[in-house]
Regions:
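Extracellular beta-sheet repeat scaffolds used for adhesion and glycan interaction
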Residues: 85-96
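C-terminal edge strands of extracellular/lumenal beta-sandwich accessory domains
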Residues: 22-35, 52, 77-87, 113-140
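Extracellular and analogous surface-interaction loops
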Residues: 51-61, 105-112, 138-140
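Beta-sandwich interaction modules
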Residues: 95-109
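Sec-dependent bacterial lipoprotein signal peptides
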Residues: 1-20
Length: 140
């Protein structure tokens, strides 16, 4: 006769303790890394190339946007994103026919030294003159 009552009392005590366990605990909310914007500019001559380095401080999305190609925004150039290995920019993503507003997007799995390379793909000639470019890179 007392067993069902005892079990019920034990069950109520266990439920009360379980409900109390979460009280006062602050849930862990992941923080998003601060996004850094780097702007790189340069002037491409025939067969020319430039490498720009930047530091990524956390995992996350890396986006490079070819924001300007002058004097003719329709002319193609090449640009790539990669990692720095020693003194070399090892391309991971590349567009060999990029025009103004083209975007490269990747994900940094770890922080470290990354690079952007901008290069002539045959569009810059002595007749066209040098091309001035601007690339914006957003990264954690």
């Amino acid at each position: 006769m007392f067993r069902p009552f005892g079990r019920g009392l034990l069950l109520c005590a266990a439920l009360a303790l379980a409900a109390r366990c979460g009280a006062g605990a602050t849930p862990i909310v992941p923080t998003n890394p601060t996004i850094t914007t780097d702007t790189f500019t340069g002037q491409l001559t025939p067969n020319g190339a430039f490498t720009h380095q930047f530091a990524v401080h956390a995992t996350g999305k890396v986006t490079a946007t070819l924001t300007s190609v002058q004097p003719d925004a329709t002319k193609t150039i090449g640009f790539s994103l990669g990692t720095v290995i020693g003194t070399t920019c090892q391309a991971v993503l590349a567009n060999d026919a990029a025009v103004q507003t083209n975007v490269l997007t990747g994900t940094a799995q770890i922080g470290g030294s990354f690079c952007l390379r901008v290069y002539d793909v045959g569009s810059v000639t002595t007749d066209t003159g040098p091309f001035t470019y601007t690339v914006t890179v957003e990264h954690p």
